[in-house]
Amino acid sequence: MAIQFVTKESLSRIDESTGQVSRDGTKTALLLLPYDIGFIAGYNDLYVAEKVAVKTYGAMVMCRTGTFVGIVGYLDSPPLGNTIIDIEKSGPGIAGTSIFSTKPQFTQTNNLTAGVLSTTTFASGNQIRFKVTTLGNVSQPGSGMRVILKCKV
């Protein structure tokens, strides 16, 4: 088994296009690393799938500056009609606004149709909220939703 030694200095994030050098002058850190964020909806307290509802299911504060790359999702039970989700970004001086110009949706299938990103950047301190915004059919909106917001930092 390989063991890698990691130090604080070797994790310094350097953009070489600026002419900066690493602390020890030899190592540079990787940039644009994956920073995927998972959200769930439509589960009870025992993680048994249940119908999704129109509400906010998760919120977090971003701790790094980065970019939104895309979104993927899956429902254990597909909806009848279109169940639409949204991710809103807010922060100092920014009201909660969607990061999508076309919101992602489950269109009578288990897999999420990705939507179109209109906001692609976030900063440390920005808040994001994951919501189910529209149910195509209240009696069969889908259940057991898992969504991953793909980001890079």
Region roles according to the model:
Residues 27-85, 137-153:
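Beta-sheet-rich sandwich/jelly-roll-like modules and their strand-loop junctions
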Residues 130-138:
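Short beta-strand-plus-loop segments that form exposed binding edges in beta-rich domains
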Residues 11, 20, 32, 40-41, ...:
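Short linear motifs centered on Gly/Pro in flexible linkers and helix caps
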Residues 18-20, 43, 66, 124-130:
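Glycine-centered small-residue hotspots that permit tight backbone geometry or close packing
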